[in-house]
């Protein structure tokens, strides 16, 4: 994958998203980030993928003990049953790998709990198999800040590209003239974009007011 230039950016038609182990057990020992932030961000990321019709794979690990996928995330794809694994490394589960290969897409976008294990393992393995791996660092987290940081450094050294969920959204949209997705993304940003979402909603309000103002 080129490191610079337009082709280095994410494209919705080339992307596939895999969301790994956003479950109660993992959240219980998440200490690198505020858990509510990760919940917000991963749901925002999932909704963004849905706006752009980016195939999304949901997967859990031993949900009988670790709990089901968090409800807000499952609600984005109510018809999809998460792939429940025994493998710690998602990329060793043939069902996940087969689904990715079947999509034909090479930009692999990953988010997981925890970063040092369930994000790092599949990221490093998929890189060796020729995928362009993008790790969504603010929709992932580790058991400590150091664990998350060391995991990100390790994956970057291996060739992964660190991104935030808003960066993913921006690269998929690229141009606000793309009306097919602009309105849907605007709704996601207003709900999950934090201060950026508030500012965006305010901008939309001002634009609407200008359009409705009678000519002088």
Which residues make up each language-model segment?
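Glycine-rich oxoanion-binding loops at beta->alpha junctions
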Residues: 82-104
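Glycine-rich phosphate-binding loop at the start of an alpha helix
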Residues: 43, 94, 116-120
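A short acidic, amphipathic alpha-helical/loop segment
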Residues: 69-72, 95, 121-125
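A short acidic, often aromatic-flanked loop/helix-cap motif at beta-alpha or helix-coil junctions
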Residues: 88-92, 167-174
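A contiguous pocket-lining binding segment that forms or flanks enzyme active sites
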Residues: 107-165
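Active-site acidic carboxylates
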Residues: 1-87, 149-156, 160-162, 173-216
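Active-site beta-loop-alpha junctions enriched in small/polar residues
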Residues: 61-62, 88, 138-140, 168
């Amino acid at each position: 994958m080129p490191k610079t230039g337009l082709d280095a950016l994410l494209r919705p038609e080339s992307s596939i998203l895999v969301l790994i182990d956003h479950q109660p057990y993992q959240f219980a020992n998440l200490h690198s980030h505020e858990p509510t932030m990760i919940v917000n961000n991963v749901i925002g990321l999932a909704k963004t993928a849905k706006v752009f019709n980016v195939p999304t794979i949901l997967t859990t690990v031993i949900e009988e003990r670790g709990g089901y996928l968090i409800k807000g995330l499952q609600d984005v794809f109510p018809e999809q049953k998460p792939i429940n694994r025994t493998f710690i490394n998602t990329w060793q589960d043939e069902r996940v790998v087969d689904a990715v290969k079947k999509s034909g897409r090479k930009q692999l976008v990953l988010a997981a709990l925890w970063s040092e294990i369930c994000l790092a393992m599949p990221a490093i393995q998929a890189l060796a198999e020729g995928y362009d791996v993008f790790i969504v660092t603010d929709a992932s987290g580790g058991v400590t800040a150091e664990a998350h940081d060391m995991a990100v450094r390790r994956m970057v050294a291996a060739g992964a590209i660190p991104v935030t969920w808003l960066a993913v959204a921006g690269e998929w949209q690229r141009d606000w003239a793309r009306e097919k997705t602009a309105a849907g993304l605007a709704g996601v940003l207003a709900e999950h974009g934090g201060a950026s979402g508030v500012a965006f909603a305010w901008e939309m309000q001002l634009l609407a007011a200008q359009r409705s103002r009678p000519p002088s």
